[in-house]
Curated annotation (Swiss-Prot):
Gene source species: Lycosa singoriensis
Signal sequence, start to end: 1-17
Family, similarity comment: Belongs to the neurotoxin 04 (omega-agtx) family. 01 (type I omega-agtx) subfamily.
Disulfide bond residue pairs: 51-67, 58-97, 60-83, 69-81
Expressed in which tissues: Expressed by the venom gland.
Database matches in InterPro entries: Toxin_34
Known function: Insecticidal to house crickets. It induces an excitatory slow-onset impact that leads to irreversible spastic paralysis. It also modifies human voltage-gated potassium channel Kv1.5/KCNA5. Most likely, it binds to the voltage-sensing domain of the channel, suggesting it does not block the pore but prevents its opening at physiological membrane potentials. The recombinant peptide binds to the channel in an irreversible manner and slows down the hKv1.5 current activation kinetics. It is not toxic to mice, when intracranially injected (at 0.5 ug/g mouse).
Entry protein name: U2-lycotoxin-Ls1d
UniProt-annotated location(s): Secreted
Protein origin, superkingdom: Eukaryota
Keyword annotations of the record: Disulfide bond, Ion channel impairing toxin, Neurotoxin, Potassium channel impairing toxin, Secreted, Signal, Toxin, Voltage-gated potassium channel impairing toxin
C-alpha cells in the first residue's frame, strides 16, 4: 500500500514539473509575441519593400497593402515576399492592426 502511495506521489510531482516547464515556455513565447507587436506598432514597410511572410499583413504600410509571397516561397531560398496592393478585404482585415494609426487619417 505504501508503495502505491509513493509511486502516485512521484507521478504527481513529475506531471507538476512538466506543467511548470510548459508554462515557462508559454510565457517566453508570449513575451516574444509582445515584442513583435511593439515592432509592428513602431514601423510599417513602404509598398514594394521586402516583408516577412510569416508575420501579419500589419507590417505593410497602408490599409490595402498586404505581404504577398510567390508560389511555394517557403521551399525556395531566393523567393522573397513584398508589400503589394491587395483586395478590398485586406483593408477590412487590417482594421485590427496595432499600427493602423500610421496610415489612417
Amino acid at each position: 500500500m505504501i508503495k502505491y502511495v509513493l509511486i502516485s506521489a512521484l507521478l504527481v510531482v513529475a506531471v507538476y514539473s512538466f506543467t511548470i516547464e510548459d508554462n515557462e515556455d508559454a510565457l517566453l513565447e508570449e513575451a516574444e509575441d509582445e515584442l513583435d507587436t511593439e515592432e509592428e506598432r513602431r514601423m510599417a514597410l513602404p509598398p514594394g519593400a521586402v516583408c516577412n511572410g510569416h508575420k501579419s499583413d500589419c507590417q505593410c504600410f497602408g490599409a490595402k497593402y498586404e505581404c504577398s509571397c510567390p508560389f511555394l516561397w517557403r521551399f525556395r531560398r531566393s523567393a522573397k515576399c513584398h508589400c503589394k496592393k491587395g483586395w478590398a478585404w485586406t483593408a477590412v482585415k487590417k482594421r485590427s492592426c496595432h499600427n493602423r494609426y500610421q496610415w489612417s487619417g
